[in-house]
Amino acid sequence: MQNIFNKIYESKSLNQEESYQLFKSIALGKINEIQLSSILTAMQMHGESEKEILGAIYAFSERMKFFPRPNYIFSDIVGTGGDSKNTINVSTSSAFVAASCGFKIIKHCNKGVSSKSGSSDLLNKFKINLNTSLENSKKILDKLNICFLFAPKYHSVFKYASKTRSILKIKTIFNLLGPFLNPSRPPLTLIGVYKKDLVNPMSRILKKLKYQRGIILHGDDTDEVTLHGTTYISELLNNKIYSYELEPEDFGIKRHSKSIFVEYSPEENYHIIKKTMQGKGEKLHEELIAVNVALLLKIFGHENLKENTKIALKKIRSGDVYKHIMQVSNMLKED
C-alpha cells in the first residue's frame, strides 16, 4: 500500500487495479484520517483519472446494499457538486418536475459536503423522510414516480470518509463516485460535473458500466445546464458516445445575463424552490430547472428539447409540482 501512497504523493495517476486496492482499504476502514486527508487532497490536486474513478467505483460497489431494480425504465439525475457556486438545488427540483410529468426517477442523494445544500438537506426541509423502508420507497416510486435513496443507508463504507470530507470541505474523488453508485443501478442517468475536463472521461465510464443511455454535462462552471452560456455534453447512446454543445436558444429560451448569478444559503435555496414549485417563482429559476428537465426527458427518448422545455415550464407554472412534493412527503409520514 505504501507504493500506492508514494505514487499519489508524486502526482502520478494510479492504474485501475491500484485504485481498486486503495479504495477497498478505505472501504474496510484500514486507512486512517490523516492518510485519507492527504490522499484525497493529492488526488484532487493532480486531477482524478478515469482509471482511478473506475477502480474506486468497483471497490465501493462490492460493499453497496442494492435496491431492487424495477421492471420499468427509470433514471437518476445528479450533480457532482463541488462547483463552489452554491446555486439552487437544480437536480432535485428537476427530479420532482420529471416525476410530476410521469417519468420514473430514483434519486441517489446525500448531504452537502463541498456545497452548502445537498439534495438530502433540501428534502429534509420538505419533510421528506429519507429513513423510510425499502418497501415503502418502492411503493412511492410505483405510485408517485419518484423515490430517494439516502447514500449512508446503502453505503456503510462512506462513514470511513465522512469526517475527513467534512473537515476538508473541498471537492474530492467522492464527488465523482456518488453519481455512479446509485443502489438501484439505473439504466439511464443525467450527471452534471463541476469542470469541463470531466465530461468526456465520465461518459466513457458510463459506457464501461454498461448504462443504456446517459448524458454527462457541464455548463459554464456549474454542474447543470446553463442559461447564460454554453453547455458541454457527452451523450452515451446505443453504446456510442456523442459530444456536442447546447446554447439556451436550443431549448427555446432567451439567454440570461451572467450578472444574475447569486449564491444562496440552504434556507434561501428551500424557499426559492418551494415558491418556484408552487408556480410563483422567478422566470430565471423556472427556466433553469426547465432546461435541465428537458435534457432529462431526452434520455427517456423525448428528443425535442424545445418541446420538453415547454412541458416542464407548463408543469412548474401550474403549481402541480409542489402538490406532488407534498404527496410524497405525506405518504412517507405514513411509514
From Swiss-Prot:
Q: Which residues form a coiled coil?
A: none
Q: In which pathway does it act?
A: Amino-acid biosynthesis; L-tryptophan biosynthesis; L-tryptophan from chorismate: step 2/5
Amino-acid positions noted as binding anthranilate 1 in the UniProt annotation, renumbered to this chain: G79, N110
State the encoding gene. trpD
Q: Which organism is it from?
A: Buchnera aphidicola subsp. Schizaphis graminum (strain Sg)
GO CC annotation terms, alphabetical: cytosol
Q: Provide the function of this protein.
A: Catalyzes the transfer of the phosphoribosyl group of 5-phosphorylribose-1-pyrophosphate (PRPP) to anthranilate to yield N-(5'-phosphoribosyl)-anthranilate (PRA).
Q: Which UniProt keywords apply?
A: Amino-acid biosynthesis, Aromatic amino acid biosynthesis, Glycosyltransferase, Magnesium, Metal-binding, Transferase, Tryptophan biosynthesis
Origin superkingdom: Bacteria
According to UniProt, the reaction catalysed is: N-(5-phospho-beta-D-ribosyl)anthranilate + diphosphate = 5-phospho-alpha-D-ribose 1-diphosphate + anthranilate
- The first-level EC class reads transferase
Its protein name is Anthranilate phosphoribosyltransferase
Q: Which residues bind Mg(2+) 2?
A: D223, E224
Q: Which prosthetic group or cofactor does it need?
A: Mg(2+)
